[in-house]
Amino acid sequence: KTGLKAAGVFAGLVAMDGFHLSNAVLDELGRRNRKGAPDTFDVEGYLATLDRVRADGAPQVFAPTYRRDLHESVAAGSIVSGTGVVVTEGNYLALETRGWGAARERIDLLIHIDVPEEVLVLRLINRHEEFGKNPLAAGHWVRTVDLPNARLIATSVHRCDEVWREPEDEPESGVVDDDTADDL
């Protein structure tokens, strides 16, 4: 083995999805019909968590997670502690608007994974159906919420350090193979 694993360095995960505003708050703000848009996340909470995790000698940091089966965030759903490396993922990490620009400043290496739109649409519809939407509702959500968000994300790709493109001939395969994963 090579890379971080071989050096005994382990990575913690802080997923942006854990910072979805609750459905009750989204209802109160009138944003639930756009859940997943940049302003439906607690960006300030996300930034504060990144700051806590990145601090030298950081103790255990409890980070929220997202449960798709519940369609809700779960407070303190994961523990991130003195790992030395923190992996974070999310759609809006390269955006320059509404606080997201500060997220980019906290990320040492930002990678955008580029997926052809037709593949993205199929994956999103399948995911929505898997978690309870009927095919018509899933397609509507993808067209009216997810695709506009994806197009917004595409406007900020220039702020990423790298762009990984999924092979055209293997649209359902992942972008990281076993050899690449061993180097992480």
Question: PLM features: residue spans?
Answer:
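A conserved segment at the C-terminal end of the G1
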Residues: 1-8
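Short glycine-/polar-rich loops that comprise or flank the Walker A/P-loop
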Residues: 9, 105-109, 157-161
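The start of beta-strands in P-loop NTPase/AAA+ ATPase cores
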Residues: 10-12, 84
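Conserved nucleotide-sensing/catalytic segment adjacent to the nucleotide-binding pocket
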Residues: 12-15, 21-67
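Conserved beta-strand scaffold positions in the cores of enzyme catalytic domains, especially
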Residues: 13, 110-112, 163
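Alpha-helical scaffold elements adjacent to nucleotide-binding pockets in ATP/GTP-utilizing enzyme cores
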Residues: 45, 49, 120-127, 141
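ATP-dependent NMP and nucleoside kinases share a basic, alpha-helical "lid"
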Residues: 70-127
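Small-molecule kinase domains that catalyze NTP-dependent phosphoryl transfer to phosphate-bearing small molecules
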Residues: 98-101, 126-177, 184
